[in-house]
Amino acid sequence: MNILVVNAGSSSLKSSLFLTVEGRVEATPIWQAQVDFTYKPGEALIQTRRRGGGWEPFPSASPEGGIGQLAPLFQSLWQGEGSLLPQAAEIGGVGHRVVHGGSLYRQPTLITPEVERAIEQLIPLAPAHNPAALAGIRLLRQLLPGIPQVAVFDTAFHQQMPLAAALYPLPYAWAEQGIRRYGFHGINHEHCARRAAEILNRPLEELRLITCHLGNGCSLAAIRGGRSVDTTMGYTPLEGLMMGSRSGSVDPGILIHQLRQGMSVDELDRILNRESGLKGVSGLSSDMRVVLEAMEAGHARAELAFELFVHRLRSQIGAMLMSLDRLDALVFSGGIGENSAPVRAAACADLGFLGIQIDPVLNAGSPRNCDISTSDAPVRVLVISAQEDWAIATACQNLLQGE
């Protein structure tokens, strides 16, 4: 059986096809696709690749048509010359990443009309992402009628946080209206926790972990016994750490001040989400690689952006530690977490008093799914590849098999 994964965002789409062998999902997909709807005015960039091959162009689409026009991309899996599958029925299930499931969904869920309506009702909490997920769900239902579809929610992993971690110190009536901390990146935080247990060869139930998902979006999670007990993102993915173009947490009084100065709500939203973070401070880019290159060339604001990013990261690592009774491992994942040795080194600098000490040689050696601590460090530091699509496929497979 094959599992198709669809990860639809506001301006992009990623998809993977995984083969299952003896009930287990293979780690490497046999087919991948990526769509960038912002590639050029009036043109989307579509690329596909098969296992072992490179990316190849697929006939372009118009950005205005959105996800609904991507039927030929998915149909190419079972139709036409060179198709991978003899028929559409070879796909046994479709797994969708859904960013926001609110407090309703704590685990992967078979998509029914009721679930679809709930995802639609949650659009105000994820206006950039839930509509894209719905478009993907509806397109694949049209292309693969009768094939079960599963929603895997980015918020689900955090829904068992203690109320003290989940609620804001605001009027309780607001919490009753659903204004609370939901957390995000849960699919990868949970994957990292399970993978850490494998690397450390210890039962997940006994581990105390802090997982750092650092990419264009960034969040941390404190994980005790495989369960999230705290996280840095909240009601929206805007809370918490400094990110690529998002501000992270700021004094709400600043926002009130700007509104009183005449800034519109839409403009404030745009600045906080798209013009802040690394991009806003450096004045250069939301890409940490660009910031590091500029810093090495002596760019003062790039250096400031890096230092601010690291300061806030270290501060929140400390905050996550307070939700645990000890720390067994600190885990780095995501585009920055996996690929930026300078960020890992700076984040862990002078933390020997906590038992954290990384080996500079191991840290600099492009580590993947391994331990980069010194041999005698009480707390292990791991680098784990984010494999959200595989995690979604596995969750889909387990649900369909009744595990």
From Swiss-Prot:
Cofactor(s) required for function per UniProt: Mg(2+); Mn(2+)
Catalysis: reaction(s): acetate + ATP = acetyl phosphate + ADP
Gene3D superfamilies documented for this protein: 3.30.420.40
Family annotation (Pfam families): Acetate_kinase (PF00871)
Binding site for substrate: 97
Cofactor binding notes: Mg(2+). Can also accept Mn(2+).
Protein name (Swiss-Prot/TrEMBL): Acetate kinase
Residues reported in the UniProt entry to bind ATP: 14, 213-217, 287-289, 335-339
Gene Ontology terms for molecular function: acetate kinase activity; ATP binding; magnesium ion binding
Job of this protein: Catalyzes the formation of acetyl phosphate from acetate and ATP. Can also catalyze the reverse reaction.
Binding partners and assembly: Homodimer.
Gene: ackA
Active-site residues per Swiss-Prot or TrEMBL entry: 154
Organism of this sequence: Synechococcus sp. (strain JA-2-3B'a(2-13)) (Cyanobacteria bacterium Yellowstone B-Prime)
Class of enzymatic activity (EC top level): transferase
GO annotations of cellular component type: cytoplasm
